[in-house]
Curated annotation (Swiss-Prot):
Compartments where located: Cell inner membrane
Function recorded in the entry: Cell wall formation. Catalyzes the transfer of a GlcNAc subunit on undecaprenyl-pyrophosphoryl-MurNAc-pentapeptide (lipid intermediate I) to form undecaprenyl-pyrophosphoryl-MurNAc-(pentapeptide)GlcNAc (lipid intermediate II).
Cell inner membrane as UniProt keyword: yes
One cellular component term from this protein's GO annotations in UniProt: plasma membrane
Name of the featured protein: UDP-N-acetylglucosamine--N-acetylmuramyl-(pentapeptide) pyrophosphoryl-undecaprenol N-acetylglucosamine transferase
Family annotation (Pfam families): Glyco_tran_28_C, Glyco_transf_28
Gene: murG
Annotated source species: Prochlorococcus marinus (strain MIT 9215)
């Protein structure tokens, strides 16, 4: 049996960084020993399998304030720590998905002349990809048009890999409310979204009167959860591993518009109402949302414009019943479903090809 090479995966923070890296790790673990580098006090310890040898560093989120200098010192110290880890584990290749762990990892890898691949899942590249992408051997893109923002990088369009469950059909979980009413999945990403939770809280009475069934994922890091007692047609959870099954079997998703969510909706061909996070870097969540909103597969509502009235009117319009040849159907929802089919992107094995390419080249 040939000896496996060592792959360091540097991904941390939000599900948008972690889930694509997990998907890639699962695809290549038969040929590589996986070592995972993350950040303390984030989602990493809950999501990363023990077999991936998770190591965490203390890196705080950079902020524009008087302590910025000390944060850069912290990043520099992290770079030296990562150099030691790369040497200790005899790493042959580094794969990263952006985020605060990525910058020192890229610098450390280039110092040791270890090849680096970074994957950029957003349409508008993040800060690390923008400023450090040129140091990487390849920048893999979730969307084709991202190439125009990275002229000095070696870019390859691969799409964004998703969790394994999204590539197969999954039954609806037993705990989901039963009934004939439309099923809504409301979620704010792995960290939750206060604005989405709030608007749902305000409109819940209206939705239940309209016979909607609702699964509400409030997020792990929501410090003050909008606790509402579960009822026949409403279930609230902090987190679930059954997101693929929920999205595949629901009628409509209401969510933020991180790149991971956009690609999950595209894969499942699922209509949505998207409420982009307004403080995302370079407004990238709104740009992500526009990819499917412009094709008619989603309704984009800016957080500054959303209200109880706007939210309820939007849902009433989407679920307005039309009769055709004696058969009732949701005309706008059905049109949104057809439009989502045109957005299909297949990306499951593309990144695997490029990672395994380095087995031969290095």
């Amino acid at each position: 049996m040939s000896k496996k090479n060592n792959l360091l995966v540097a991904a941390s923070g939000t599900g948008g960084h972690i889930f694509p890296a997990l998907a890639v790790s699962k695809e290549v673990e038969d040929k590589w020993n996986i070592h995972w580098l993350g950040v303390k006090q984030r989602l990493d310890s809950n999501l990363i399998p023990k077999k991936y040898n998770l190591r965490t560093l203390s890196i705080k989120t950079p902020r524009k304030n008087i302590f910025l200098f000390y944060q850069y010192i912290e990043i520099l110290m992290s770079t030296f720590q990562i150099i030691r880890i790369l040497k200790e584990k005899k790493i042959n290749l580094v794969f990263t998905t952006g985020g605060y762990i990525s910058a020192p990892t890229i610098i450390a890898s280039k110092f040791l002349r270890i090849p680096v691949i970074i994957h950029e899942s957003n349409l508008i590249p993040g800060m690390v990809t923008k400023y450090f992408g040129f140091l990487c051997n390849y920048v893999l893109l979730g969307f084709k048009n991202t190439n125009s923002y990275l002229r000095n990088c070696k870019t390859i369009f691969t799409g964004t890999p998703l969790r394994e469950q999204f590539y197969k059909s999954n039954p609806l979980p037993e705990w989901v409310p039963k009934g004939k009413g439309p099923l809504l999945i409301v979620m704010g990403g792995s960290q939750g979204a206060k604005a989405i939770n709030q608007i749902l809280n305000e409109s819940l009475e209206f939705l239940l009167k309209k016979q909607f069934r609702i699964v509400h994922i409030i997020g792990e890091s929501n410090q003050q959860p909008f606790y509402i007692k579960n009822t026949k047609n409403y279930i609230q959870k902090k987190f679930t591993n059954e997101v693929a099954a929920l999205i595949q079997n629901c009628d409509l998703v209401i969510s933020r518009s991180g790149a991971g969510t956009i690609n999950e909706l595209i894969e499942a061909e699922k209509p949505s109402i998207l409420i982009p996070y307004p403080d995302s870097k370079n407004n990238h969540q709104e740009k992500n949302a526009m990819i499917i909103a412009e094709s008619g597969g989603s309704v984009l509502i800016n957080q500054n414009n959303i209200s109880k009235e706007v939210f309820e009117e939007t849902l009433e319009r989407i679920f307005k019943i039309k009769s055709k040849k004696g058969v009732n159907h949701y005309e706008i929802l059905d049109l949104m479903k057809r439009n989502m089919v045109n957005n299909k992107i297949k990306s499951k094995n593309e990144i695997k090809k490029f990672i395994n390419y380095f087995l031969k080249e290095f």
